[in-house]
């Protein structure tokens, strides 16, 4: 049976569904920032950006951009009622101090035990860029990761052990890919959802670590 991968927007929309009311959430640079566009207006979620924003909203409409309002990825945002601005140092104190309920990060690799690599591939021509990812990986109460299931070369991004430099150890709680959702639990990598038409056997073939099928029943 054939299957269709989720688009980046569909991944973001799916993550938005799992963010509880009243949560304080940091959205990492890249795909995670799209989540802001899929949070319902009547759902109180307080989005944090490491450059010193709290309670920002989705991107503005074309022509309504304010150059003073950008997130850590230099993308335009809007501010919600009650939103606030603060010093970069205060922002990192929030990140490191356990004040964020969830952070959503991208990834180069995720290991079976929840180790995360998302700042450097080790390639000689690559420019390392850790930003606040290490602070978020250890400081947030839960870490969600959004990523393609495999690289452009078809190599698994979910692996038995990291081969890239680690961002954080045993920090990932849930993985959202274009093929499935995986919970990282003491027993291993538990697949709780997968795209329609994708067999568990095919998903396992595309994954570099052993999976547990929890999609039945």
Curated annotation (Swiss-Prot):
Catalytic activity entry: 3-oxoadipate + succinyl-CoA = 3-oxoadipyl-CoA + succinate
EC code: 2.8.3.6
Organism expressing this protein natively: Acinetobacter baylyi (strain ATCC 33305 / BD413 / ADP1)
Family classification: Belongs to the 3-oxoacid CoA-transferase subunit B family.
Quaternary structure (record): Heterodimer.
Root EC class: transferase
Pfam family, one: CoA_trans
Protein's recorded name: 3-oxoadipate CoA-transferase subunit B
Matching PANTHER family: ACETATE COA-TRANSFERASE SUBUNIT ALPHA (PTHR13707:SF60), KETOACID-COENZYME A TRANSFERASE (PTHR13707)
Gene Ontology terms for molecular function: 3-oxoadipate CoA-transferase activity
Keywords assigned by UniProt, alphabetized: Aromatic hydrocarbons catabolism, Transferase
Superkingdom field: Bacteria
KW Transferase (keyword) present: yes
Catalytic residue positions: 50
Pathway the protein takes part in: Aromatic compound metabolism; beta-ketoadipate pathway; acetyl-CoA and succinyl-CoA from 3-oxoadipate: step 1/2
Gene Ontology terms: biological process: beta-ketoadipate pathway
């Amino acid at each position: 049976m054939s299957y269709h991968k989720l688009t980046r927007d569909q991944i973001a929309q799916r993550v938005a569904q799992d963010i509880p009311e009243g949560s304080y959430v940091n959205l990492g640079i890249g795909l995670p920032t799209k989540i802001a566009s899929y949070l319902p207006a009547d759902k109180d979620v307080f989005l944090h950006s490491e450059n010193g924003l709290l309670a920002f909203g989705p991107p503005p409409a074309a022509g309504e951009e304010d150059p003073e309002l950008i997130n850590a990825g230099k993308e335009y945002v809007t501010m919600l009622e009650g939103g606030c601005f603060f010093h970069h140092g205060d922002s990192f104190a929030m990140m490191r101090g356990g004040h964020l309920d969830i952070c959503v990060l991208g990834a180069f690799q995720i290991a079976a035990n929840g180790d995360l690599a998302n700042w450097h591939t080790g390639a000689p021509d690559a420019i390392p860029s850790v930003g606040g990812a290490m602070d978020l990986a250890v400081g947030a109460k839960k870490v969600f990761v959004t990523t393609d299931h495999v690289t452009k070369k078809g190599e698994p991004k979910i692996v038995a052990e990291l081969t890239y430099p680690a961002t954080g150890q045993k920090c990932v709680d849930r993985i959202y890919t274009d093929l499935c959702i995986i919970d990282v639990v003491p027993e291993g990598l538990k697949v709780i959802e997968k795209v329609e038409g994708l067999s568990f056997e095919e998903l396992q073939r595309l994954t570099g670590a052993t999976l547990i099928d929890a999609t039945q029943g």
